[in-house]
Amino acid sequence: MAEDNYNLAQADLRIVSGEQGSGKSTLATALIVDDCYSHLTGIINTDTGEYRKAQPLNENEIKSLESKGITYHLLKHIRVFSNVDDSSRIVVKPKGWVIDSPIRVFTNYQLFGIRHKLIGAEDIIESINDDTITDAWLALDESVFTDKQDSMTSLVKMVAKFMAQARRRMLHVIIIAQEASMIATRFILFSTTRIECSYDEDTYIVDYEVSNNSKVMQSSFLYAPDYWKFFKTREIVKQPQYKVDKILTEMYKPSKR
């Protein structure tokens, strides 16, 4: 479980950085997944579509489990209700079922087991004057529209204007990059939290240090395999097609003689 020691009730822009293979995407995914599981309202059978009301365990239920020698895990233990009567019981979430959660999630990389919407730059631009992307998580993994090298383009400038509305939109933004210096300055200025990751291949632990605007540094960790099933660890995040087309056009443009 990723330990989130800052208030999710407030809008936040987190910059998650670290070298390749440091667990950046794992941590970003963990923050989103943990929030969805903490607010789950049901579970759905992926084969039959059957729906069962469910909820996360409360503090007393967690203590009761642990008093029996059972180690509680947010992603495993839930209370499920009967579809016949009002009875319920604590179970380990069965295989083949995904959670139903009111938490809204927008990402530029694929997630599994969590309801979300894949978005590109055009989705952000098109929603800048409406409330489509509000009260939600917005995670951008090594995205071209936060890249410092493109900081003077109209695209990045417009996305930056959108990010400036993060608090009013109640967004929990995560920008992922190998180095914070690779992110356009505007986003650095808007950031409220910096997270630096490192990964231990022997223990499968992602260690991370969190600092916020109060200069308080906190260290924590998570067990990476708990979250690998929620995303493709080797997914290649696609670049906007118009940028690819533009470069190809320039490459194959006849040379002047």
Name the predicted role of every residue range.
Residues 114-169:
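Conserved nucleotide-sensing/catalytic segment adjacent to the nucleotide-binding pocket
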Residues 1-8, 41:
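Pre-Walker A adenine-sensing motif
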Residues 16:
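Hydrophobic anchor at the beta1->P-loop junction of P-loop NTPases
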Residues 1, 193-195, 207-257:
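Conserved P-loop NTPase motor module
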Residues 24-25:
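Conserved lysine of the Walker
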Residues 19:
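P-loop (Walker A) phosphate-binding loop of NTP-binding proteins
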